[in-house]
C-alpha cells in the first residue's frame, strides 16, 4: 500500500530484538512499485524478479551486468513490453556497489 512501516533490529545483551514499528511514512512501498512495474512494463504472460543487489568491490557490479546481459538478453513484445531478459533499473559503472534490476521470464 501507500503506508510504509519502518522496523528496526536492535542488539541487546541477550541477542537481538525486533522493534516492530519505529515510524510510519506515507510513501510508495515496494508492493506499489512492483504493481506499477508489472502493469506498465511487463507482458501479461511473464513472471519476474525485482532484485536489489550489493557488490563488495569495484568492478563486481559491472562484471555481473555484462554476464547477465549476455545470458539473458532483453526481448520485447510488439507493443514494447518486457517479454524476457535482464533489465537494469540503475546505471552500472566500474564503481557501482548497489544495483536494482528486473529479471523476467515467460511463465
Regions found by a protein language model. Give the residues of each.
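ATP-dependent carboxylate activation and anion-phosphoryl transfer catalytic cores
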Residues: 1-107
Amino acid at each position: 500500500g501507500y503506508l510504509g512501516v519502518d522496523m528496526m533490529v536492535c542488539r541487546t545483551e541477550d541477542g537481538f530484538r525486533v522493534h516492530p514499528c519505529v515510524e510510519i511514512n506515507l510513501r510508495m512501498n515496494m508492493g506499489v512499485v512492483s504493481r506499477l512495474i508489472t502493469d506498465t512494463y511487463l507482458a501479461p504472460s511473464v513472471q519476474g524478479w525485482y532484485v536489489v543487489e550489493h557488490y563488495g568491490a569495484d568492478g563486481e557490479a559491472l562484471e555481473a551486468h555484462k554476464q547477465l546481459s549476455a545470458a539473458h538478453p532483453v526481448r520485447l513484445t510488439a507493443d514494447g513490453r518486457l517479454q524476457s531478459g535482464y533489465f537494469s533499473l540503475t546505471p552500472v559503472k566500474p564503481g557501482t556497489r548497489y544495483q536494482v534490476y528486473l529479471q523476467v521470464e515467460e511463465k
